[in-house]
């Protein structure tokens, strides 16, 4: 059995869970998320906890039990507290600003990069060189952060580019004669 999958998920106040037709729906103050649950996993929702059990004793069912539990725990955390990812812009003239639902980036190209935010994800720019991406879906927040970083990843000689706030860029030495 999966050690991760055995642990029950405690529902915080303000969160509701509904399991019907193979779909697990979690509602909270920050929105609603839905996840299809694999047929090899059984779900029990009672007195403020969610537990998962494999439908049979196969290795696949045990693996899926842990996966479904982890995805559901992220959904519960997302609709109650939310997720955020911080990015920093390093480089002369690199700037970011929010225009409606889009993020406008000036990254040293001959044109501005406009990145449209998907539904459920918001961007903030406390300063011109900081971006905070927030949302209730952990996968979407991480995907948007990776896409924004992908426009100009940190280069290894000067470290210029878009980087995660907790990322350490290892700089190479230049070629010596």
Swiss-Prot record:
Keywords: Ribonucleoprotein, Ribosomal protein, RNA-binding, rRNA-binding. PROSITE patterns: RIBOSOMAL_L6_1. One of its GO terms (biological process) is cytoplasmic translation. Pfam families: Ribosomal_L6. GO terms for molecular function: rRNA binding; structural constituent of ribosome. Belongs to the universal ribosomal protein uL6 family. NCBIfam families: L6_bact. This protein binds to the 23S rRNA, and is important in its secondary structure. It is located near the subunit interface in the base of the L7/L12 stalk, and near the tRNA binding site of the peptidyltransferase center. Part of the 50S ribosomal subunit. This is Large ribosomal subunit protein uL6. It comes from Ralstonia pickettii (strain 12J). The gene is rplF.
């Amino acid at each position: 059995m999966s050690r991760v999958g055995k642990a029950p998920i405690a529902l915080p106040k303000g969160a509701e869970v509904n399991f019907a037709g193979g779909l697990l729906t979690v509602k909270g103050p920050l929105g609603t998320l839905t996840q299809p649950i694999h047929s090899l996993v059984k779900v029990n929702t009672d007195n403020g906890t969610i537990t998962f059990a494999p439908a049979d004793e196969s290795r696949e069912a045990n693996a899926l039990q842990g996966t479904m539990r982890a995805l559901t725990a992220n959904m519960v955390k997302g609709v109650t507290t939310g997720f955020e990812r911080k990015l920093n812009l390093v480089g002369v003239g690199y700037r970011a600003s929010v225009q409606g639902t889009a993020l406008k980036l000036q990254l040293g190209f001959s044109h501005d990069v406009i990145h449209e935010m998907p539904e459920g994800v918001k961007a903030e720019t406390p300063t011109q060189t900081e971006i905070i991406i927030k949302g209730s879906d952990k996968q979407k927040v991480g995907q948007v952060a990776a896409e924004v970083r992908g426009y100009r990843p940190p280069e290894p000689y000067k470290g210029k580019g878009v980087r995660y706030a907790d990322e350490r860029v290892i700089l190479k030495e230049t070629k010596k004669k």
